[in-house]
Amino acid sequence: MTDRLVGMLALFAYSFLSNVALAVVPHEPAVLWAGPRLGIWSTALAATAGTVLAACVDHAVFVPIVTRLEQRRGVAPGLLQRWFARAPFAILAASGLTPLPLFPFKALAFTACYPLGRYCGALAAGRLPRYLLLAWLGVAVHLPTALFIALFVLLMIPTVRILFGPRHA
């Protein structure tokens, strides 16, 4: 295998791990770093493919759980669910493009039992342009490896605080 293919497979795997439901690692530094090494399109496509696989896993795991919980409770759709139902594809795609956290919108898709194909398509439609932009930024702005490490550590702080911070009873 070529170094480029190995790099794409590594980015695919990392993108999967950084986008699966309860991910604890940031994806931005990896995409920025891979851009100049793998090329803009190769980076964006590998990262998007990993994201879509993570979306399939999330959907397969969480939609049945959420459906069972809602059936037990007998809860009517709330205001946010009704708002989401107006344009779910656009909302998911737009939230995937922005730097806003994606998980609240994913949760809305799960509670709405949004179909798998559309869900994955919406995430790909939002994430591909984001990854293209991040990969391009990695090519356009030559950043030293130490800065990528610092960015990764900085983005890990919220996760570390959640995992290892003080517990409130």
Residue map of PLM features:
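Membrane-interfacial helix-loop-helix
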Residues: 1-13, 36-119, 128-131, 136-169
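Hydrophobic transmembrane alpha-helices of secondary-active solute transporters
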Residues: 14, 18-19, 126
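Short helix-coil transition sites and intra-membrane helix breaks within transmembrane domains
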Residues: 17-28, 95-103
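Hydrophobic transmembrane alpha-helices of multi-pass, membrane-embedded glycosylation machinery
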Residues: 30-35
